Amino acid sequence: MHSDPQSVDLVRREVIETAETLVVKVGTNVLSRDDATLDVDRIAGLVEAVSRVRATGRRVVVVSSGAVGAGIDVLDLGGRPEDLPHLQAAAAAGQARLIHHYDECLGQHGSHAAQLLLTADDFTER
């Protein structure tokens, strides 16, 4: 289709600039410091950028990783766990902290964060 990288970038930019709704997936690496803990300043920067886009009348949905990094801070683990039980504990403890930071930053722009809770029917009924 478009084999030229510049052409692909132009198409991507046009799609982003004309879309009514943008879905932004934020990976753990974007939100993590070198020590694997949560970088709250990155959340603030992301929220600032999202707010600027929303001010143009477009909808923005943020899908975020980062709960494990937030949980490392909460549980004072000193680094990313390797085993599944500790990863699960970090994610569980960190999810509330992550949502709190998003909500705090979004509140400064008149918005709120919410966690979408899915059921099995959400996958079978659509």
What is the predicted role of each segment?
Residues 1-126:
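Nucleotide/pyrophosphate-binding catalytic subdomain
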